[in-house]
Amino acid sequence: MEKALTQRDYESLADLRHHIRRFLHFSEVAVRGLGLEPHQHQLMLALKGLPGGTRPVIRELAEQLQIRHHSAVELVNRLSTGGYVQRQKGENDRREVLLTLTPKGERVLRELSLHHRAELRKAGPALFGALQRVMRSIKSRVGREADLPDRNGEYVRHVGPERRQTPSRAN
């Protein structure tokens, strides 16, 4: 890892952080305006956005939100009390607890998601531009061969303009 940073590096990182924070602030205000806390909204969105085949269980949501299991349980408890999510027993394993959004939860999440999407239409280009500047800075500093994430977040080695290969794990 390169250790030297330029003033431009700091400026581009600060600009990216600023645009991320602006969007997060928008989100917090929108969510609280509907009587929820940001983590509650994040859990509802994570639940609705789970990839197909992923079991909607607390362990999975805790991983998605990068929080501890007991914190996810508390969020689910509050959302359940508020009528936003419900627990159901698993069909094959009755010990398993599956989570679903209630109609109220679906309605509120849809409203928030529409607001977030509209805000991203406005703020997205500046956020994307800030991210591109940071990534260009990284790429220019490490040269033509660099491990950079693809659109799935997987790191791939870019070798010249035509070839891509997965970096070896033996580092």
Sequence positions of predicted segments:
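N-terminal leader segment of winged-helix/HTH proteins
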Residues: 1-34, 82-84, 150, 156, ...
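Charged, amphipathic alpha-helical coiled-coil/dimerization segments
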Residues: 77-135
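N-terminal helix-turn-helix DNA-binding core of bacterial DNA-binding proteins
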Residues: 25-68
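C-terminal regulatory/oligomerization modules of transcriptional regulators
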Residues: 1-7, 118, 129-171
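Short, hydrophobic-biased segments on the C-terminal half of alpha helices
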Residues: 58, 76-77
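The N-cap/first-turn positions of alpha helices
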Residues: 20, 37-43, 105, 120
